[in-house]
Amino acid sequence: MNKPFSDNTKPTKKHPQRRRIVYIIAIIIALVGIGLVFYAHRNLTYDHGTQAKLQQAGFQEKQAKLPDGSVLNYGEGPANGLALVLLHGQQVSWEDYAPVLPELAKRYHVYAIDYYGHGGSSKNPMKYSATAISTDISWFIRQHIKQPVIISGHSSGGLLASLITANVPDMVRGLVIEDAPFFTTEKGRAESTFSWRSFKDMHDFLASGQSNFTQYWLDHTYMQTLFNAKDPNAWDKIVKQPALQYMKQHPGKIPRIWYYPPELQVNTLFDLTANMQDKTGEYDLRFGQTFYNFSWFNEFDQTATLKRITKPSILLHVAPPTQSGSYYDEHGVLASAMDDKDAQRVHELLGSKNKLIDNIKSSHDIHKDQPKVFIEAIDEIARH
């Protein structure tokens, strides 16, 4: 027979240690969740504050209308020193210089210009050549800035800055060339470069009748060969499938994948596909097509142009990619703007007034990856 419970039986004790463990786990889960929210927010909005920062630094977006009706869009900073003209690289706009503009604006009067086919400037293919663009920017310098300038150009903007310096030396104090594709854009050499193959994608897309360039790019870009060098499925897993899934859920939008931080530059790859033709951006793919068929280079002799430059200049040139240690991939395709021999040739053609700063540990965008190096180069030219 079971004994009845005695009156003095104590109630079962709860386990405070177990409860504390549960609380700690709950807090950890909450913190991880909050961390993921902040992580995703940063990855999705890392560039959303650009305009506010530029306005805070005193920049205003303006437009100049040329006698023939063409429009040059530009960002102008406060008048805090010598005039400085900045010419961006291809597929972006003047805001691409945002990482260095606030600092430069403290001691220069900055004019960051969208050249034709980009940003808010005219989209007239008749103007898509080095000679036409450099002529009109020279007009802008003479008619609007009205004083000699320091001029710097990135990538194809560096080609333009060099041509302007050669053509109107009375309106230029000095030149900074940022990783410009000298000689590698010439017919016979260009076909073995990553850049030319990218322009071929633009040409082929325009001829295809398809409506979404980002999707076309995902299927055809030579970039997938670089990604798949060690893993044949890397491009699909890392880039293509996440992008296609995003575009399925957000039709007409450029992919922005929440789990990729800006340092990996995967979302930057997507951003560079934004274009006027499919209404995702302001870049005119017909501009890139002129690099594919070489019409952009009509009457532009790169060697002769460099020889004609008499102003002080600095050439900034990046080091080979750290992954491969070479400017070329395993198929002999140039994956950079120039190799070391090209940079040395530019340096020699520019003569004794040129300084070559080589092997900069940076991607193609030195002003973003190494802003201090870029700003110091501008300051050095200003001291001449």
Task: Describe the function of each predicted region.
Residues 2-84, 106-108, 146-147, 338-345, ...:
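Alpha/beta-hydrolase fold catalytic core
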Residues 314-361:
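Conserved loop-alpha-helix segment in the C-terminal half of the alpha/beta-hydrolase fold
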Residues 70, 76-120:
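Conserved HGGG/HGGXW glycine-rich cap/lid loop of the alpha/beta-hydrolase fold
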Residues 362-370:
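Catalytic histidine-centered segment of alpha/beta-hydrolase-like enzymes
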Residues 287-305:
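Active-site nucleophile elbow and catalytic-triad environment of alpha/beta-hydrolase enzymes
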Residues 147-191:
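Conserved hydrolase catalytic core segment
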Residues 176-220:
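Flexible "cap/lid" loop of the alpha/beta hydrolase fold
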Residues 67-68, 75, 115-152:
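Active-site loop/oxyanion-hole signature of alpha/beta-hydrolase fold enzymes
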